[in-house]
């Protein structure tokens, strides 16, 4: 499939070199290789005989020609690589800042402690579980059910249906829909 880019010219040159080196690419297949015996005995466009594989089974490399299109293509690839590297550095910087902010919000961790990202996530998860437990213990305080204790569709988590009717009728829900 042709994209019209400079790499198409380079790909075409590589195909010509491979054909002259005893390997014929099948145009119907993306990366298929056909080795017909009659193709090996024919000649290249420049009149030199195609080089087949010898008894050693090794293929000789044709000397590569430096072309101005190849240099432009290499520069384009380098620009793309540099841009991708810059995006990845920026992404990693944002991720590192997020982990450092998460680390500073954990109450049990001294500020000078070095934690891995995995340890930070584990501590944050256990801290969230601890906070949920505190909320679960205090969920009926002042007659309110905290929204974190509600599950879809706004039922108190972990209560049988009979108990839910009693809790909902005697408790008020937090938020704009509270009655």
From Swiss-Prot:
Keyword Transcription regulation set for record: yes
Pfam families registered for this protein in UniProt: HLH (PF00010)
Gene Ontology annotations of biological process type: branching involved in ureteric bud morphogenesis; branchiomeric skeletal muscle development; bronchiole development; diaphragm development; embryonic digestive tract morphogenesis; epithelial cell differentiation; gland development; glomerulus development
Sequence segments annotated as region (Disordered): 23-87
SUPFAM superfamilies (UniProt xref): HLH, helix-loop-helix DNA-binding domain
GO MF entry, a single one: DNA-binding transcription repressor activity, RNA polymerase II-specific
Main location: nucleus
Superkingdom per UniProt: Eukaryota
Localization, UniProt: Nucleus
Domain bHLH: 79-131
Alphabetical keyword list: Differentiation, DNA-binding, Nucleus, Transcription, Transcription regulation
Biased amino acid composition, Basic residues: 50-64
GO cellular component: nucleus
Coiled coil: none
Compositional bias segments (type: Polar residues): 34-46, 70-80
InterPro entries, sorted: bHLH_dom (IPR011598), E-box_TF_Regulators (IPR050283), HLH_DNA-bd_sf (IPR036638)
PROSITE patterns, per the entry: BHLH
Biological role stated in the UniProt entry: Involved in epithelial-mesenchymal interactions in kidney and lung morphogenesis that include epithelial differentiation and branching morphogenesis.
Subunit structure: Efficient DNA binding requires dimerization with another bHLH protein.
Name this protein carries in UniProt: Transcription factor 21
């Amino acid at each position: 499939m042709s994209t019209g880019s400079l790499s198409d010219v380079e790909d075409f040159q590589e195909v010509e070199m491979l054909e002259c080196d005893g390997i014929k690419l099948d145009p119907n297949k993306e990366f298929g290789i056909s080795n017909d015996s009659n193709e090996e005995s024919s000649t290249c466009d420049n009149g030199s005989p195609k080089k087949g594989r010898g008894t050693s089974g090794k293929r000789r490399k044709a000397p590569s020609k430096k072309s101005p299109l190849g240099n432009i293509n290499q520069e384009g690839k380098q620009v793309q690589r540099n841009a991708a590297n810059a995006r990845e550095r920026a992404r990693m910087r944002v991720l590192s800042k997020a982990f450092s902010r998460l680390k500073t919000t954990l109450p049990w961790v001294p500020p000078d402690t070095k934690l891995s990202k995995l340890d930070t996530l584990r501590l944050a998860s256990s801290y969230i579980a601890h906070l949920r437990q505190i909320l679960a213990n205090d969920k009926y305080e002042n007659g309110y059910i905290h929204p974190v204790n509600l599950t879809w569709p706004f039922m108190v988590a972990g209560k049988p249906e009979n108990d839910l009717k009693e809790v909902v009728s005697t408790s008020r829900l937090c938020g704009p829909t509270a009655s």
